[in-house]
Amino acid sequence: MALVTCNFTSPSPSSGGSDLRRWNQIIRNQVLKGNVELAIHSYIDMQKLGFSADNYTFPLLLKAAGNASSLRIGLTLHGQTVKTGFCYHLFVQTALLKLYSSLGLFLNARKVFDKMPVRDAVAWNSMLYVYTSCGQMDNAMEIFDTMPSRDLSSFNIMISGFAGAQSVTSARNIFDRIPEKDVVSWNSMILACMNAGETAEARTLFEAMPERNVITWNTMVMGYLNNQLYTKAIDLFYRMKAGDIKPDYLTLTGTLSACSHLGSLETGVNIHIYAEKLKQASSPHVVTALIDMYAKCGSIHNSLAVFYKSKTKDIYCWNALISGLALHGFGYAALKLFNQMTVNCIKPDDITFIGVLSACSHAGLVKEGCEMFDSMKRDFGITPKAEHYGCVVDLLSRAEHFDSAFQLIERMPFEPGESVLGALLSACVIHQDLEAGEKAMELVVKRDWCLSDGEYMMFSNLHASCGQWEEAERWRNMMNDSGIVKTAGCSEIQVNGRFHKFLAGELGVE
């Protein structure tokens, strides 16, 4: 931690307790402002001047450690509370509990909790929170059942925990036991339903709520988005827009993502105009969502316009545009943007390389793609994942470098998954290379005898592309005998502001 110069007059130790209170106030102000380093350095300066921390100082410092997610600082402070005897004070014990809760260290938190001679509501709820945030719902339920008294926060923490565990029945049991529910209770229960895929029940709760806040609407919009009900997400956004509660950046990003999935440029443009009106269009989250939406809706020039207009570009903005350029086959432009990104001292991450490698694959830039793959670990310290190997296998296979693709698969530090083998098989079908295709089929069967409908169809199509009709029919029959049904294709179009869904084989519209 770098030395920080503090612009304040240091209290004198000869002044006594009043100046200790001044030190505590200085530290408190710095913690509230998020100046964790200043808070810690003030504590160090305070000790150098002969002041000792008390049961008010340590909770402030422990809060600073929690805000910085610094286990090292937290453990050091915990050790000092033990040495000074303040570890037995309720304020300090509660602060330690909150620290370990924020860091997800439920064993450390439980040790502190068990040693507390007196536990207030904050202590009980902190212990509940640490268990629920770590997914330890059985332990959380044990604490909940043994609590001498429960407040509304206790119930809400439990509902949120069960929501994260996708246990909607348990969440509902807690929800129904609440004497007086607040908006947090309802929001948490809606989240539990959405996480479990029970969107109709979530909507019923939403309509029954006595009051809603922006989090309520966002929970519904994101819930629909995560359950692939994109039209419902957009419809709800327009209903929210017509009401008293204004959408925030989360609402806008969620709805723009729904537009991306639907390919609805018209709706996306309308939301962009509305975001400008709300003065939210310059938010990095919204900028990223706009870049992604325009690219996936076929308007890459608008993606570029949004990107270059933005004054603040984080890693997500760069990644969104690189992926967008890849989607449109602009390989050299994606590589140029990658270089521009590094010149601007933006460090690429694993998502960046997925975009760049995908761009090289779509543009047929074999040499450049292989060089980028090699540079991941060498120049940026990023270990390639299955998705990166999948991109390079796709790159090599598209260019008919099947020997190199198989060699890369053999060198992989893990078993090839569906994304890797799927890319290989798909290229074999396109290039009608039966020899490479049969070798790829062996790898798929070796990996898992439970083939997907897509893999059965690719095996069949491979033989059909080479004129082996009987073998193609045999694979289709094997799929039918296994009880696997090919997933029907689905399309949605927007007509006069309304979305209509078409399923393959259907005559009507939804």
Where is each model-derived feature located?
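Terminal (and in a subset, N-terminal) low-complexity or junction segments at the ends
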Residues: M1-A123, Y129-D151, N156-E510
